[in-house]
């Protein structure tokens, strides 16, 4: 049933819910949820690349509207478009290449800078929006910005449309398939969408073999619910 679960995860373009997987392979939803989290942990294998050439970076916030949450998941003192109930994710994508995503604590310089330095080659040209969290990387990279606040989205080769397109795909999966991704497990969901993007040009069979070659990424049920 593990092989069936892996195949279904990799062949569904937008993801598969634990409820649907439980029906497809005839296990409980609790078991299906655990299997999905284990599989997503392995999908980290395609979320660790080194990005070169032209790279776009951008952050997004993941989280449903507070009014739509179950009572035990509502965030106190959260109103309107406040980000208190949302979790930031940083994305970096090499144009015509791969993407890397990391869940972050905040969108501050101290949080963003070391992650970009870890995954983006120093010789790369980096494109971002005008957010101040990227100011520090001017010291290490050729860094160009577009000012979304002033309605500027494209200035020649300076744009962040590629990474924003990736976020669109992630949000579609969030809204259409999963409905809720807890901050605790969000990195594993990000792994799934990152893997899917980075293997978009290869067959499902190749994806299947790639995952089986990376079962070193493991997590126990006790770790998941801790």
Q: Where would I find each of the regions flagged by the language model?
A:
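Residue-level recognition of single "structural anchor" positions
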Residues: 1-226
């Amino acid at each position: 049933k593990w092989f069936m679960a892996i195949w279904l995860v990799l062949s569904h373009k937008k993801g598969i819910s634990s409820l649907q997987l439980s029906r497809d392979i005839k296990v409980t939803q609790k078991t299906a949820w655990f299997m999905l989290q284990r599989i997503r942990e392995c999908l980290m294998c395609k979320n660790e690349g080194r990005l070169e050439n032209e790279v776009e970076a951008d952050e997004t916030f993941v989280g449903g509207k507070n009014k739509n949450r179950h009572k035990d998941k509502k965030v106190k003192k959260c109103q309107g478009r406040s980000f208190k109930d949302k979790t930031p994710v940083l994305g970096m994508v090499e144009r015509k290449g791969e993407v890397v995503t990391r869940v972050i604590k905040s969108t501050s310089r101290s949080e963003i800078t070391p992650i970009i330095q870890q995954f983006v080659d120093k010789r790369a040209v980096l494109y971002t929006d005008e957010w101040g969290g990227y100011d520090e990387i001017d010291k290490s990279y050729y860094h160009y910005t577009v000012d979304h606040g002033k309605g500027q989205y494209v200035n020649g080769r300076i744009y962040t449309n590629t990474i924003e397109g990736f976020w669109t795909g992630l949000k579609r999966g969030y809204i259409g398939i999963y409905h809720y991704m807890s901050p605790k497990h969000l990195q594993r969901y990000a792994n799934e969408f990152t893997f899917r993007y980075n293997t978009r040009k290869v067959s499902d069979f190749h994806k299947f073999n790639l995952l089986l070659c990376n079962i070193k990424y493991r997590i126990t049920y006790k770790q998941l619910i801790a």
